[in-house]
Amino acid sequence: SVVGIDLGFLNCYIAVARSGGIETIANEYSDRCTPACISLGSRSQIVTNVRNTIHGFKKIRLPYELQKMPNGSTGVKVRLKVLATTFDPYLGGRVEPPLKSVMDQANLQREDINSIEIVGGATRIPAVKEQVTRFFLKDISTTLNADEAVARNHPAPFSKSIDLPIQSSLYRNAVEEYVYDFRDKFITPEDMNKYGQPIQMKYVEHEERPK
């Protein structure tokens, strides 16, 4: 004899094939339909008997590993081996769209920009620097470290200086001071995802630094 089971979400059908033909198994719950949700000690299904109901048993054995997502849903865990030579161009390709967006928001052209300074971990990726250089048609600078960026209140990895820093020496109380006139415009994260990564960028203009 051969037993065949047709598993549905709430119901299933069990049939036995013998030499005389195929017989669909009947049961006490219904004539020939067997619930896919099994309630222990009760005929009620999952809607009215959640505590004692076993459901989804047909999905216990899976050819992949499930992963709980931050929003509470269930995802599939995937492992992928990618060479840096393949991944870097893909990552670099995601740099240009936000740059275009903020340039449009600021109503600026490439020729309006004198210097480009980028900070952050992504500046170590050659493909990212190459994409930024190609977009602005200018060499970029990475001399500004993260601590200095925080001290200058840089809110995002990509910053744009309209004018180069102007250094002038002033003698005040016999002490030489260096005054930098920075007029900066920034690309700032307008919204962040659960991982702290920007999902939408916004162009803002900051006030001039006090002298």
Curated annotation (Swiss-Prot):
One of its GO terms (molecular function) is ATP binding. The modification Phosphoserine is found at S161. The keyword Cytoplasm applies. GO terms for cellular component: cytosol; nucleus. It holds the Pfam family HSP70. Transmembrane segments: none annotated. Keywords: ATP-binding, Chaperone, Cytoplasm, Nucleotide-binding, Nucleus, Phosphoprotein, Stress response. Its main location: cytoplasm. Gene3D superfamilies: 3.30.420.40. It is found in: Cytoplasm; Nucleus. InterPro entries: ATPase_NBD, Heat_shock_70_CS, Hsp_70_fam. It comes from the Eukaryota. Belongs to the heat shock protein 70 family. Homodimer. Possesses chaperone activity in vitro where it inhibits aggregation of citrate synthase. This is Heat shock 70 kDa protein 4L. The lineage of its organism: Eukaryota, Metazoa, Chordata, Craniata, Vertebrata.
